[in-house]
Regions:
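Intrinsic low-complexity, intrinsically disordered or marginally ordered coil/linker segments
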Residues: 1-103
Length: 103
């Protein structure tokens, strides 16, 4: 990869890797965990987190998905913040990572 990743965001998005490049512009978008130097344990934890998010959607009829209790969303967001901290730690200071909470 000729351009170096400068900024990432961790966010829950349906059927995604959960990690998105924010900078530089030519690389913006979802990125595979395989392209990052992260542990298999962290990668698996992020995928489990995304799987939980995916489970909230009624895939046959998305408009009739059940509402998720605020307490559950708060717990999910705390877990996302912890995953973001671990991701930042594993990637080091050369890549900035931010978390976008689920609403």
């Amino acid at each position: 990869m000729s351009k170096r990743i400068k900024r990432l965001r961790l966010m829950a998005e349906y059927k995604s890797t959960g990690i998105f490049v924010e900078s530089p512009r030519p690389l913006i978008g979802e990125i595979s965990h395989d392209h990052l130097n992260i542990s298999p344990e962290l990668s698996e934890a992020i995928f489990r987190w995304i799987d939980e998010f995916d489970s909230w959607l009624n895939w046959d009829d998305p408009m009739n998905s059940p509402s998720v209790p605020e307490k559950e969303i708060n717990r999910f967001n705390k877990q996302g913040e912890e995953l973001m901290k671990q991701l930042q730690k594993e990637l080091g200071p050369s890549i900035k990572v931010r978390y976008v909470p689920t609403k």
